[in-house]
Amino acid sequence: MLKIADTTFTSRLFTGTGKFATAELMLEALRASGSQLITMAMKRVDLQAGNDAILAPLRQLGVRLLPNTSGAKTAQEAVFAARLAREALGTHWVKLEIHPDVKYLLPDPIETLKAAEILVKEGFVVLPYCGADPVLCKRLEEAGCAAVMPLGAPIGSNLGLRTRDFLQIIIAQAKVPVVVDAGIGAPSHALEAIELGADAVLVNTAIAVARSPVKMAHAFRLAVESGELACQAGLGNRQFDRAIATSPLTGFLSQLEEENHV
């Protein structure tokens, strides 16, 4: 079980809605993922149309929608998008994204913190996408964010946990859930994040662009569940300086030597 703000989730796999070939394929994949929190970009939603191709099908799934402010380049733009989402969708949850750099889509730490402080004061449940910066994540936590979402690698890169060392620090010191977001390109990456101690992962591109998005979504679901089960079972300590035999020697060999000398 994972609790963020006032909501409990049984799945630690969060998913996105971008890059799918069709809305029907998106829905099939999201169902296969078992995800209960699905993020969507406000810039892609037609709020004037009651039968929006993205929004209408998502509402049928019965999951929590997490509108994001992707496309915002400043705190002011992000706050405006969050307010618009609350009014249009009736949710006070928001994934805060501010990335002015259109090439690498790296989050702006200064604008993100500024927007987070404003939105928290306005009653939003804020989940900020941010760099894997332990100091920034702590500041966002102190500002009242319900979780932090540090990147594993640049958005859509599928490179995995390139920020692993910093993620470990963030996880170790966080008092709110840590959701690894961006760069997760394979189920093994998601498994690694959960085993590392992350509370959840958010995956979009790796599922949407797969040859079979439905099968890939199911694979990610199994990977995350496997990682959670492994953590519950208790992972063994790692040894770097020596090996430890799985079957320690007893007096067995000594007894054989004595018998050979008789």
From Swiss-Prot:
It catalyses: [ThiS sulfur-carrier protein]-C-terminal-Gly-aminoethanethioate + 2-iminoacetate + 1-deoxy-D-xylulose 5-phosphate = [ThiS sulfur-carrier protein]-C-terminal Gly-Gly + 2-[(2R,5Z)-2-carboxy-4-methylthiazol-5(2H)-ylidene]ethyl phosphate + 2 H2O + H(+). GO terms for molecular function: thiazole synthase activity. 1-deoxy-D-xylulose 5-phosphate binds at G156, A182, G183, N204, T205. Its EC number is 2.8.1.10. It is an enzyme of class 2 (transferase). Signal peptide: none annotated. One of its GO terms (cellular component) is cytoplasm. SUPFAM superfamilies: ThiG-like. The active site is at K95. The keyword Transferase applies. Transmembrane segments: none annotated. Pathway: Cofactor biosynthesis; thiamine diphosphate biosynthesis. It is found in: Cytoplasm. GO terms for biological process: thiamine diphosphate biosynthetic process. Keywords: Cytoplasm, Schiff base, Thiamine biosynthesis, Transferase. Catalyzes the rearrangement of 1-deoxy-D-xylulose 5-phosphate (DXP) to produce the thiazole phosphate moiety of thiamine. Sulfur is provided by the thiocarboxylate moiety of the carrier protein ThiS. In vitro, sulfur can be provided by H(2)S. Belongs to the ThiG family. Homotetramer. Forms heterodimers with either ThiH or ThiS. PANTHER family: THIAZOLE SYNTHASE. This is Thiazole synthase. It comes from Yersinia enterocolitica serotype O:8 / biotype 1B (strain NCTC 13174 / 8081). The gene is thiG.
